[in-house]
Amino acid sequence: MKHAHLIVPRTLVAGSASGELLYAPTGLSFWGGVDPRSAEVIDRHHPLSGRHLHGRLLAIPGGRGSCTGSSVLLELILGGRAPAAILLREPDEILALGAIVAEELFGRSLPIACLGERFDELAAYPWARLADGRLELHRDAPPPLEARPAEALATDAGPRLDAFDQALLAGEHGEAARLAMRIVLRMAALQGAQRLIDIQRAHIDACIYTGPAGLRFAETLRDLGARVRVPTTLNAISVDQRRWREQGVPAALGEPAAALARAYLDMGAQPSFTCAPYLLDDSARAGEQIVWAESNAVLFANSVLGARTNKYADFMDICCALTGRAPLAGCHLDEQRQARVLIEVEDLGSVDDAFYPTLGYLCGLLCDGQIPAIDGLRQRQPDHDALKAFGAALGTSSSVPMFHVIGVTPEAPDLASAFGGRAPRRTLRVGRERLRDAWRELDSAGETRIDLVALGNPHFSASEFAQLAALCHGRRRHPEVALVITSSRQVVAQAEAAGHLATLQAFGARLVTDTCWCMLDEPLVPPGARTLMTNSAKYAHYAPGLVGRQVRFAGLAGCVEAAVGGRSPAGLPAWLSEDC
């Protein structure tokens, strides 16, 4: 065997592995990007699309997109389909958390290591061996690993604990709280947090059903007597809890998905069932220290509301809710909320509402995991719906927990405030050419015939219902096109009280509550549908992998026209046309 190329990485989760190295220069969201049953990469925009992760050492710069990646990784580990190891450029708390939960609750291990600036060296090697805190890169298959006892978990490093923390860790508040505290402390050590803080509220994303492992996790905690210590809301779940049977959802999904929701309700969470908790009457407030999972909600809370939350992984969300404590790290700290990248947006003149998700998706691709500040939108003064669409798109194509829009968002009245008085590390300029490229990535179908219009990802707001009702008033959808909107029970009730539901029902629209498009499949996605249309950049990115359909992308008015006429316009919108 030839001499190996040696790297000493930072160990995030201990363990050993040897085998084929699967390298990509692009971050990967495990949720929506990896099938939890087969371990196939299903993100059709990713360079590893179609490859299988099982048994390979996966090398990616980091995660991106969904907080549910930790849940998918747990499914892979407990189902015996996980990668042999994960090698990262930068620490990824979502992936690390999935492996930590596997160790703490189920005694299963998956090594994760961080290589920093040396990550790109992996591109030249097809084989790797991780053992004894060292990574060997090989041109040929390395020797097999020798059997060895499991590595002991470090328990001495971590934050300072107060008396309450110590009582939780000692089991004085129950076994569920003790297990939750162990997980919180392991993540705090990984983050380098010096202490824990009290939190005011939590939003749980782990209620999305990804398979039996996530249900087993929740029911284990519930059966140990788990109870949340702070007001806790639930994300959109995987089914419409009240109507999944009449909607024709198979019991094989409906029953465990409903059971997962019940487990979190039994722990004291509220039945909010929304991926847009910022639309609830009692939402987070500026300056509050909160623990929110669900990527779009995290971005909105930090950026628009001015609350303080990290991009919490599934499972970490409920662990913090059960203890009422979170590591003082990341976006809980002033300095970690400052922008690092400046993105200057050229004046494009008149645009439609599709501008904001297109721009958000592009900014996520450009910012390289660093918090961006967007300059050039002050005169447009985007409203909350526009910022919601922008943030959801940004959170899909990147791992960032927040953004600033100069002159619009609360912590960015000017450039100096957004950057904490420092100069940007990078400055990028965005014009029509780059936006056209992003649009074409989202508007990926060649077909113009539309079978389904999918709205409400993230969940529709009351103002979006009003806009849609105005566009649909006095009209009827094409008989061969379904138009389906997902939203929360609370917002649907507001839309009904305002008279918008009657207008939409006369148009032929269908409403689904409790769940969202990223969790829906057949029959709510019609089995015969080949091409869907959406105004959501998030769903346009994920749908080809999640439901195997072609996707057209447009603003809300374009979606309504497609629902009426049965076809989408070919080519670019006017504000992106080559003639501008």
Swiss-Prot record:
Outcome recorded upon mutating residue 518 to A: Loss of catalytic activity. Contains iron
How activity is controlled: the entry says: Inhibited by Zn(2+), Cd(2+) and Hg(2+), but not by Co(2+), Ni(2+), Mn(2+), Sr(2+), Mg(2+), or Fe(3+). Inhibited by pyrrole-2-carboxylate and its derivative 2-thiophenecarboxylate, but not by trans-aconitate, fluorocitrate and oxalomalate, which are typical inhibitors of the aconitase enzymes.
EC numbers listed for it are 4.2.1.171
Q: Which CDD domains match?
A: AcnX, AcnX_swivel
What's the reported outcome of changing residue 538 to A?
A: Loss of catalytic activity
What result follows from mutating residue 66 to A? Loss of catalytic activity
Q: Name one GO molecular function term.
A: lyase activity
Impact upon substituting residue 295 to A: Loss of catalytic activity
Using the UniProt record, name the top-level EC class of this enzyme in a single word.
Answer: lyase
InterPro entries, from UniProt? Acnase/IPM_dHydase_lsu_aba_1/3, AcnX, Aconitase_4Fe-4S_dom, PMDh-L-like_dom, PMDh-S-like_dom
Keyword NADP present in the record's keywords: the answer is: no
Temperature optimum or stability note: No loss of activity after three months at minus 35 degrees Celsius.
Entry keyword Transmembrane helix: no
Q: What induces it?
A: Expression is induced when the bacterium is grown on trans-4-hydroxy-L-proline (t4LHyp), and to a lesser extent when grown on cis-3-hydroxy-L-proline (c3LHyp) and cis-4-hydroxy-D-proline (c4DHyp) as sole carbon source. Expression is up-regulated by c3LHyp, and by several isomeric 3- and 4-hydroxyprolines.
So which cofactors does this thing need?
Answer: Fe(3+)
Listed under GO biological process in this entry are: 4-hydroxyproline catabolic process
Q: What does this gene product do?
A: Catalyzes the dehydration of cis-3-hydroxy-L-proline (c3LHyp) to Delta(1)-pyrroline-2-carboxylate (Pyr2C). Also has activity with (2S,3S,4R)-3,4-dihydroxyproline as substrate, albeit at about 300-fold lower rate. No activity with L-proline, trans-4-hydroxy-L-proline (t4LHyp), cis-4-hydroxy-L-proline (c4LHyp), trans-3-hydroxy-L-proline (t3LHyp), D-proline, cis-4-hydroxy-D-proline (c4DHyp), trans-4-hydroxy-D-proline (t4DHyp) or L-serine as substrates. No hydro-lyase activity with citrate or cis-acotinate. Does not catalyze 2-epimerization of c3LHyp to trans-3-hydroxy-D-proline (t3DHyp).
Q: How does it assemble?
A: Monomer.
PANTHER family per UniProt: DUF521 DOMAIN PROTEIN (AFU_ORTHOLOGUE AFUA_6G00490)
UniProt name for this protein = Cis-3-hydroxy-L-proline dehydratase
